[in-house]
Amino acid sequence: TNARFAWQHQSGGEIVDGQTLPCADYASLADAIGAYLARLGRPAPLDCAIAIANPITGDQVRMTNHHWAFSISALKAQCGFDRLRVLNDFTALALALPHLPADELRQVGGGTPVAGTPIALIGPGTGLGVSGLVPDGRGGWIALEGEGGHATLGGRTDRETAVLRQIDVQYGHASGERAVSGQGLVDVHEAL
């Protein structure tokens, strides 16, 4: 698990100075932020946004795939940010979708894309990230936050059902995340 940092001098400006720091090298997120800033020789920015692979349901955040835990308000004070926004990583990715150039988009499935309709985002990693956007009726978008990777999977064929049954026995639940993620792909391969 890594923490990826970058700097943006102004809203809408170029994103520069990207660096990846192994989470295991730092006792806390604040320590990793401090190390990144020290490498750049910069003070803390006034505004900071953090996208994290974790549900954000309040001030307290405990990472699901690493030992870091923190209070958003305490992190803001400790790092000296004027504003701090912490959101789920796939919610952040979904919010970026309308800003992608057309050559970065890929049609999945049949049919023709229709502008201004809901957009889905799904991606495997340590878990299965899921998010999406729905039109807000005013030309903007509303991000859908959730942990869709935990939805139960059902097989369509006898073979799929047998694979999912084995995953269910192993974990107590056959979810999307248990089948479509780094470890999930290994488990599906072994079940086959």
Model feature map: region roles:
Residues 1-35, 144-150:
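Short glycine-rich, Thr/Ser-proximal phosphate-binding strand/loop in the N-terminal lobe
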Residues 1-14, 119-137, 185:
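Gly/Thr-rich phosphate-binding beta-strand-loop-beta motif of the actin/hexokinase/Hsp70
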Residues 31, 73, 92, 128, ...:
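Residues on a specific face of well-ordered alpha-helices
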Residues 40-44, 113-116:
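Glycine-rich phosphate-binding loop signature in dinucleotide/nucleotide-binding domains
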Residues 41-86, 91-104, 121:
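Short beta-strand-loop/turn "lid" adjacent to the catalytic site in phosphate-handling enzymes
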Residues 95-121, 158-163:
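A gly/proline- and charged-residue-enriched helix-loop-helix capping module
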Residues 101-104, 137-150:
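A short alpha->loop->secondary-structure connector
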